[in-house]
């Protein structure tokens, strides 16, 4: 193809063309990447929130891209209430099938709330007069549960600002919320002395070898009416274990519980704990108190409102192993965010859901 003299010259003067080619390629790629970053921004830029004293490495780091407005925020339907006039007719006196928890709501505001609830839950005939489906029966309990949380658990759901909860906080437009959980029981064959609830990757264990039953351990009462307590083994190596002290099994159960918190809120350990003194409860962050109240809040809602629905839900809505009701926990509301819906104030326009067994306060709209 080439003249003989050209081939002879190349053989007499060998040249390594790969080195320069690689150098040119690397330089060109670097220029291209730099131009893209200038034009489109740093795709892996991060922001940090300090959670403890300076110099202790206590911060929660997030990708800026993940801090964009949560997409579910756009799906939240809301409207201002109608301030009822003196002597306004109450829905429970004028309409059929009004939940007792909404006995103090006027006709206009009841119809406004029902329309919003149908959007929040994705159930088009929710609370339809004459409709006695299980969804309507569940709605009766869930309305009361929502009111209970907003009125009695403001220290958790309004710890930093007025936020509150509505049906949409969990449902996000779906009849069954995401991130509910069921009892799972044994997930493995066990060896002597070890429970068969771990060492198998499951969604419940967040794809770790940790126990899969931590939610039922800490959030449901045992046969003696007690809840599991977070425990870790002695900090001293080879320390003698007194009777009643936590074993490594309790430690792993606690780690599974903490891992669930981290995944539910999109945070790390130092969001609640001091990284230099995990063992010292006097050095925790303010978020630790908010989380502790949240645990008790969930325990109460499960016991009072969720578990009694076992006789109401159809078989296809029950758990695959124990036929138990779908249950809520941190991830059901938070869904990976430190505050559900990025801290959107969902209760501002819904005073009907902010009080339990009381008259809604419409003074802010007068």
What are these model-predicted stretches?
Residues 1-366:
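N-terminal export/targeting leaders of redox proteins
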């Amino acid at each position: 193809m080439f003249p003989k003299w050209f081939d002879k010259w190349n053989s007499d003067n060998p040249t390594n063309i790969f080195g320069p080619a690689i150098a040119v390629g690397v330089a060109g790629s670097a220029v291209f990447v730099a131009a893209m970053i200038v034009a489109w921004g740093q795709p892996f830029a991060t922001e940090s929130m300090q959670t403890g004293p300076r110099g202790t490495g206590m911060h929660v780091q997030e990708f800026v891209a993940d801090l964009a407005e949560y997409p579910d925020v756009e799906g939240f339907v809301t409207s201002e209430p109608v301030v009822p006039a003196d002597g306004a007719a109450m829905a429970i006196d004028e309409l059929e099938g009004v939940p007792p928890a909404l006995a103090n709501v006027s006709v206009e505001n009841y119809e406004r709330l029902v329309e919003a609830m149908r959007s929040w839950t994705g159930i088009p005939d929710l609370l339809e007069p004459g409709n006695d489906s299980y969804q309507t029966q569940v709605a009766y309990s869930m309305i009361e549960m929502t009111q209970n949380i907003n009125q009695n658990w403001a220290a958790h759901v309004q710890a930093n600002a007025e936020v509150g909860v509505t049906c949409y906080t969990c449902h996000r437009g779906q009849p069954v919320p995401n991130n509910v959980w069921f009892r799972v029981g044994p997930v493995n064959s066990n060896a002597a002395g070890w429970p068969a609830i771990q060492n198998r990757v499951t969604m419940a264990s967040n794809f770790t070898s940790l126990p899969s039953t931590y939610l039922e351990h800490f959030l449901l009462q045992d046969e003696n009416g007690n809840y599991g307590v977070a425990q870790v083994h002695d900090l001293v190596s080879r320390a003698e274990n007194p009777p009643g002290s936590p074993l490594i099994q309790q430690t792993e159960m606690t780690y599974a519980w903490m891992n669930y918190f981290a995944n539910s809120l999109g945070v790390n350990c130092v969001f609640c704990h001091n990284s230099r003194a995990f063992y010292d409860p006097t050095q925790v962050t303010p978020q630790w108190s908010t989380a502790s109240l949240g645990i008790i809040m969930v325990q109460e809602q499960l016991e009072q409102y969720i578990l009694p629905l076992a006789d109401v839900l159809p078989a296809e809505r029950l758990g695959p192993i124990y036929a138990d009701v779908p249950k809520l926990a941190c991830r059901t509301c938070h869904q990976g965010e430190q505050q559900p819906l990025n801290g959107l104030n969902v209760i501002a326009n819904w005073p009907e859901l902010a009080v339990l067994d009381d008259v809604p306060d419409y003074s802010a709209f007068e």
